Amino acid sequence: MFKYPIDVEDIPQEELRELFLHWQKIKGDRIMPRRADFRPSDVPKLLPYILLADVENDPRRYRFRLIGTATTRAMSRDVTGQYLETVPGTADMKERWDWIVENKIPYLYQGKLVWSEKSFLEYFALGLPFSEDGQNVNQIMYGLYYMLPKDRRTIPPQ
């Protein structure tokens, strides 16, 4: 599922709804906020769900700047500092990243973790564009929520 435009009601996870509302707040009446408008201290409980990528042009490439702990756990590795194309299984992901750079609006995606050893898991990705010059996307923030199976050892007895 690839949905745009989106409203907060379209987002099923509380963590991603909170991140979307915060992005809207710091955006104000602009097309998109600057990365400097985002202060991690304003949303500390959301940090494990955040991925931040730099957008490079000529040629267009994406570099993982920051990866939250929920994503490193889902991937079973940390790809901070690496380029998107160096991670196997990310061709479809690059299409969505190109889309947000060109369209400059948020989107919601639901799919399988084809870029992870845990490709059987479902996840949600909330893409949020950021711009230093107010016109061009130079960073993308993703809120990522993984549909991890419940571990029977962690479920309290009934």
Positions of PLM-derived features:
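Intrinsically disordered, low-complexity terminal regulatory regions
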Residues: 1-158
